[in-house]
Amino acid sequence: MANPSCRLLSFGLVPYCQAWQYQRRWVRAKQRDRQREDGLMLLEHPPVYTLGTGSQTKYLKFDPAYPPAELWRTERGGEVTYHCPGQLVGYPILDLNHFQKDLHWYLRQLEEVLIITLEKLDLQGERIAGLTGVWLEGHKVAAIAIKVSGWVTCHGFALNICPDLEGFSHIVPCGIGDRPVGSLNQFLPGLTVEIVQPLVIQAFAEVFPVTWIATGEMPCWLSDDVA
């Protein structure tokens, strides 16, 4: 069986609400037409806090009526997290019928993408039993939270490469208060999103066998309101 086609889109800096809209359009398009290609969106966000469907406000260290940056509640799983420039965010839109219809398997595969990425930098990423994400010498460097509808995925992962970590001080990231957040740049100074992103793309294709569609152009069905 041929590998599924996967459109690769690299956006740069994108407001959270816009990227969320792209995801929802893509998921709807795939649910209407299962032949529509899978996708991977890679981007950065301006400073923003996001909550999952069941996120508890006790993990916020600020009044949600007066957040220090934008605050959104989304349909993903997980607790509060923070996005900002210097953090590479990946939103895979995958039909798990092409791979394995198992959410726990999918979460572990996303972790594997990031662990392989770190290996390419001679960094030893690791999992922690009972938790989701990737750690480096005890510091959480990657967060993962997903939404799956009709076996089509959205939301995804956030890899801290060279962000300003101060924004994390206003929350209990992912509801985990006893483990610090870190960035790759702390362990390998000089890293940038531009350096790491190609490694993430390589690692993604190693974990999820796909045939890339890398036109660099936004498809009309994704950008148009009619999508």
Curated annotation (Swiss-Prot):
Top-tier EC class: transferase
HAMAP family, per database record: LipB (MF_00013)
Lineage, broadest ranks: Bacteria, Bacillati, Cyanobacteriota, Cyanophyceae, Synechococcales
UniProt site (Lowers pKa of active site Cys): K140
Name under which the protein is recorded: Octanoyltransferase
Gene source species: Synechocystis sp. (strain ATCC 27184 / PCC 6803 / Kazusa)
Keywords: Acyltransferase, Cytoplasm, Transferase
Residues annotated for substrate binding in this entry: R76, G77, G78, E79, V80, T81, Y82, H83, A143, I144, A145, G156, F157, A158
Role summary: Catalyzes the transfer of endogenously produced octanoic acid from octanoyl-acyl-carrier-protein onto the lipoyl domains of lipoate-dependent enzymes. Lipoyl-ACP can also act as a substrate although octanoyl-ACP is likely to be the physiological substrate.
PROSITE patterns: BPL_LPL_CATALYTIC (PS51733), LIPB (PS01313)
Protein family membership: Belongs to the LipB family.
Gene Ontology terms describing biological process: protein modification process
Gene name of the record: lipB
GO cellular component: cytoplasm
Record EC number: 2.3.1.181
MF annotations from Gene Ontology: lipoyl(octanoyl) transferase activity
Main location: cytoplasm
Database matches in PANTHER family: LIPOYLTRANSFERASE 2, MITOCHONDRIAL-RELATED, OCTANOYLTRANSFERASE
Coiled coil: none
Record-linked InterPro entries: aa-tRNA-synth_II/BPL/LPL, BPL_LPL_catalytic, Octanoyltransferase, Octanoyltransferase_CS
The reaction(s) this protein catalyses: octanoyl-[ACP] + L-lysyl-[protein] = N(6)-octanoyl-L-lysyl-[protein] + holo-[ACP] + H(+)
Keyword Acyltransferase: yes
Compartment(s) where it occurs, according to its Swiss-Prot or TrEMBL record: Cytoplasm
Domain BPL/LPL catalytic per the UniProt entry, residue ranges: 34-212
Entry keyword annotation includes Acyltransferase: yes
Active site residues of this protein: C174 (acyl-thioester intermediate)
UniProt pathway annotation: Protein modification; protein lipoylation via endogenous pathway; protein N(6)-(lipoyl)lysine from octanoyl-[acyl-carrier-protein]: step 1/2
